[in-house]
Amino acid sequence: MYTDSHCHLSFPELVAQLPDIRQKMQAAHVTRALCICTTIEEFDQVHHLAKTYDNFWSTVGVHPDNEDIYEPTVQDLVEKGQLPRVIAIGETGLDYYQMSERKGGRSIDDMEWQRDRFRNHIRAARQIQLPMVIHTRASSDDTLRILKEEGEAGDVGSAGGVFHCFTETQAVAKAALDLGFYISFSGILTFKTAQELRDVAAWMPLDRMLIETDSPYLAPVPYRGKTNNPSYVPFVAKILAELKGMTPEQIGELTSTNFDRLFPKLQAS
């Protein structure tokens, strides 16, 4: 049994293929998937998937590199986060790389709106005690700092969350673990150039790991460059299994157990 802890099944590349994807998931023993919300406008579609299929769940949140869209208030996030089948807040966080690239080298000082948005997501998560799905790219220092400033190590620590599609150093991983977070590995782990990330994964405690596809992006080897989907998450488990001296099936069961522990609202949804 495998669980894809992060996918975007509402995106156009995947939603039209959903019946085929579900068949492929079944054949690959991928029994569950968490469908990630990236804008408030997208939420209804993501939530519809979770309400329609009993092995899908949803989040609510706004991705940090979506600038010119409706900005949710804490109350917006709280109201949607309390709906059935919504088990996390996110994805949220900071992405200085994407915004700098798109905006012609904009400085970090120009991205205060990202930090304000992140704080609102943290406050919503704290209010309703939902875990968060964290996106951080070229911004780990600020991500960790804001989590600490917002009391993540205190009253939100019990809810925690996950640093998804992890690509950072072991030091960042340890800091995230110390705050009560889990770490999720994607198809990047299979890339030839990702030896440093595999070293982090080899070090990672077994009880704090998740696996994901981040589909339709980041298809693992041997499908790199193609459209990703949740049925490919066992390829991530295979690499983790090699690093840990386990079988892929054991990694699948272990990470599914971790998923259940991190997202307790699963049991009530």
Predicted regions span which residues?
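Mid-domain alpha/beta scaffold segments of enzyme catalytic cores
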Residues: 1-269
